[in-house]
Every structure is written in structure tokens, then in C-alpha cells.
Amino acid sequence: MNMNFLEFEQPIAELLAQIEELKHVSEHVGSSVDLTDEIKHLEKKNEELTRKLFSDLGAWQISQLARHPQRPYTEDYIARMFTDFDEMAGDRAFADDKAIVGGTARLDGQPVMVIGHQKGRDTQEKIRRNFGMPRPEGYRKALRLMQMAERFKMPILTFIDTPGAYPGVGAEERGQSEAIARNLKVMSSLKVPVICTVIGEGGSGGALAIGVGDRVNMLQYSTYSVISPEGCASILWKSADKANVAAEAMGITAARLKELKLIDSIVPEPLGGAHRNVDEMANLLKQRILTDLNELNSLHTDELLRKRYQQLMSHGYC
């Protein structure tokens, strides 16, 4: 797969292009010229440069990484972390929203309910998934699956990655705000463990609608905010060009939200971001979720609900 590089990654892209060119030359000239040492030197230089660049990323750069077109989506994690996934469709009221995927699965043999936003890779898939922006029926499908999980005493695992809930007229007419509000209400009192993870964009109420849980985790280069940096800049400065300034001011990164005690854990990403090594990222996330599950499974239902309530009530009181 050809790697897409963001603007701030261009020095890395140039080094990798040099490495590929040397490898190509080496293959064609055979043993007459040994370029092994030069290639190794450039590969080491590339790793050092990548570590340096990624050691001091700003909020706007992290926001770009969270939206990277090759970043793993919910279905990528389902394929790597779970077995026996059985997708379920529809809200039993209006339609099946493809922006939300969900179903039963096994995590190391334990039955769980998996629910997440799903974006698309190519144009056709993006349209089918509505660019990862759920309509009310998507959130009602998620609610149906969560209530099913509660009946069968299965932990619920959600994967958050959306620019926000779809703001179209039809969605509003069918009760977008009510669907989100109902999810918040029900999730706060579910009698099974709920673990939520922001894997990319955590956009406003559209993210929060599947984001109330006993544990809320974020991947290292994901974001969580009430509005996009571009949206904030358009309101405050009447120009999306100030998005980088807005991103810094909004406190949208995992590190900042951890400081504010709005999330529980930050899941480290492979060097260069989750898209550089999806298998490694899936394994890191799986270990985080298994650790959380082991802790939550040991709690009595009353204790689980009490701790969840305390956590929700503590927000805003750092």
C-alpha cells in the first residue's frame, strides 16, 4: 500500500523516496555495486527523523493524523481483535445506517457486543457510510444492540470515529437530538461493563452518543471535541484558515483530555501513527481493552453503576 504523507511529514517522505530509489538501483545493478550500508544509514536516519517529528506534534498536526485517509477504522480493528463477529443491522423502526457497524463477537473467547462508527476508503464506500456521520437510525441501532448486550450480560465495546452526527434535514426530522440524548441516558445506567475508545475523530454529540462508559480511552493521535477546529475558527475568526490556532486553544488531544480527567487512558500508537502498522495498533488496543475488562468484570453491578455515576458527575471538577 502506498503511504499518504501529511504536509508536516514531507521530510520523511523525501527520505523514504531516496531509500526506495537506492533499493531499485541495487536490484538492477546486482552485485556490482553494494548499496546496503547506504540504505541502512538512510533507514536509521529516517527512524530518527520520524521520532523527532512525532515527539513534539501540535494539536493541529494531531487533528490531521486523526483524519488520515489510511487510518484504521472500526472494521479494521474488528478483523484483527475479535473472532466470530456477527454483524447486526437496522434500528427496527426506519432503516439500517451503514455509518454505524455493530454485532456480537468474541474477545479472547469472551462474548462481547462491538459497536463503532465506520467511514469509507473510496468515494463509493464513503457515500455508503455517509462519511462516518450517523443518522438517528444509526444511533437507534446502536441503542438496540446495547440493550441486547445488557439482556445477555455481554460487555459493550464502542469505537468512536466520526466528524459528528449527520446534520441533514431528514435526520433532524427523524429526531437526531432525541436519539443522541436517549443513548446518553441509557448508556449511563447499563448494567454491563462499557468501554469506549476514540480511534480517530471524536466529533461532538455524534461521538458522545456511543461514548458514555466505565472506561473512556483515546488513541495517542486521536481527537475529541465539541466542534472541529475549522468550525471553531469559522465562528471565532470568520475564517477556517485559523484552524491551527483553534485546535491549540480547544484542548482536543488525548494528552490534554487526560490532564482534564475527561478520559481514563491513552493507548500509544506505533511510530508514525496507527496507519503505519495496523496489526501492532490493534494488538496494543486489544491489550488495553482486556486490562479494562478484567477490572470491570470483577465489580458487582451496583459497584459498577456507582463508579460510572461518580465518574460522570466528576466531569468539570478537576
Curated annotation (Swiss-Prot):
It is an enzyme of class 2 (transferase). Component of the acetyl coenzyme A carboxylase (ACC) complex. First, biotin carboxylase catalyzes the carboxylation of biotin on its carrier protein (BCCP) and then the CO(2) group is transferred by the carboxyltransferase to acetyl-CoA to form malonyl-CoA. Residues 41-295 form the CoA carboxyltransferase C-terminal domain. One of its GO terms (molecular function) is acetyl-CoA carboxylase activity. GO terms for biological process: fatty acid biosynthetic process; malonyl-CoA biosynthetic process. Pathway: Lipid metabolism; malonyl-CoA biosynthesis; malonyl-CoA from acetyl-CoA: step 1/1. It is found in: Cytoplasm. Its EC number is 2.1.3.15. It comes from the Bacteria. InterPro entries: Acetyl_CoA_COase_a_su (IPR001095), ClpP/crotonase-like_dom_sf (IPR029045), COA_CT_C (IPR011763). PANTHER family: ACETYL-COENZYME A CARBOXYLASE CARBOXYL TRANSFERASE SUBUNIT ALPHA (PTHR42853), ACETYL-COENZYME A CARBOXYLASE CARBOXYL TRANSFERASE SUBUNIT ALPHA, CHLOROPLASTIC (PTHR42853:SF3). It catalyses: N(6)-carboxybiotinyl-L-lysyl-[protein] + acetyl-CoA = N(6)-biotinyl-L-lysyl-[protein] + malonyl-CoA. Acetyl-CoA carboxylase is a heterohexamer composed of biotin carboxyl carrier protein (AccB), biotin carboxylase (AccC) and two subunits each of ACCase subunit alpha (AccA) and ACCase subunit beta (AccD). This is Acetyl-coenzyme A carboxylase carboxyl transferase subunit alpha. Belongs to the AccA family. NCBIfam families: accA (TIGR00513), AccA_sub (NF041504), PRK05724.1 (NF004344).
